């Protein structure tokens, strides 16, 4: 009910929806899916996503912990086709706590794989005056990135939101043409997995 505080408590799940968070009265199509290998059950709060007025507290219990480092766990939204995407969350005493903005399908996943950094047209960097990297992370996405040229901070940005490439426009006052230069790029994903690569250009 939209005008009451709603509680949903099941084994391994706790959801509190404060009064006024739902736009209307809704009858949830709730179900739990269990796979013996999963870190947590998959909880379908509703078969189609229902947006809420604001974020609400969701807690999902872990059934097992295959990875000791608790920062590698995250609450994942689950698509109709079974794909997972990162919502976030924090581990505390066997439970993942997160705030959600819609009633959909959720579970807990783990990400221990660092991002992949690929230089784009590296042989042309010195000539074009542009250093370009493609940074990808399959599970939790790119969270932070930092680049240096010859040990000094270099500003990288994402001028094209479609490609998502990291681009640095070289400043001739700071980067001398013709000499050999070393670029170091560090990329971190949503669970703190980090990749650092060193690349040279002339």
Model-derived segments and their meaning:
Residues 18, 59-63, 130-138:
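Short edge beta-strand/loop segments characteristic of extracellular beta-sandwich folds
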Residues 40-42, 80-90, 152-158:
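Surface-exposed loop/edge segments in extracytoplasmic proteins
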Residues 49-52, 123-128:
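Short, solvent-exposed loop/linker segments at the N-terminal edge
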Residues 104, 129, 179-183:
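Exposed beta-strand face motif in extracellular beta-rich ectodomains
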């Amino acid at each position: 009910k939209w005008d009451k505080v709603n509680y949903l408590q099941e084994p391994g799940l706790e959801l509190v929806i404060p009064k006024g968070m739902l736009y209307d009265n809704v009858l949830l199509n709730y179900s739990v899916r269990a796979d013996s290998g999963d870190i947590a059950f998959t909880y379908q709060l509703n078969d189609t996503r229902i947006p809420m007025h604001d974020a609400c507290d969701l807690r999902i219990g872990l059934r097992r912990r295959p990875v000791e480092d608790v920062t590698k766990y995250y609450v994942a939204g689950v698509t109709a086709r079974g794909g997972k995407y990162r919502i976030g969350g924090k581990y505390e005493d066997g439970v993942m706590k997160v705030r959600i903005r819609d009633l959909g399908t959720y579970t807990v996943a783990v990400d221990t794989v660092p991002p992949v950094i690929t230089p784009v047209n590296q042989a042309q960097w010195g000539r074009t005056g542009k250093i370009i990297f493609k940074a990808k992370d399959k599970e939790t996405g790119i969270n932070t990135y930092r680049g240096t040229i010859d040990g000094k901070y270099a500003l990288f940005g994402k001028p094209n939101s479609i490609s998502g490439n990291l681009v640095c426009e070289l400043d001739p006052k700071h980067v001398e043409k013709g000499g050999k230069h070393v670029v170091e790029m560090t990329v971190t994903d949503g669970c703190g997995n980090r990749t650092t690569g060193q690349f040279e250009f002339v």
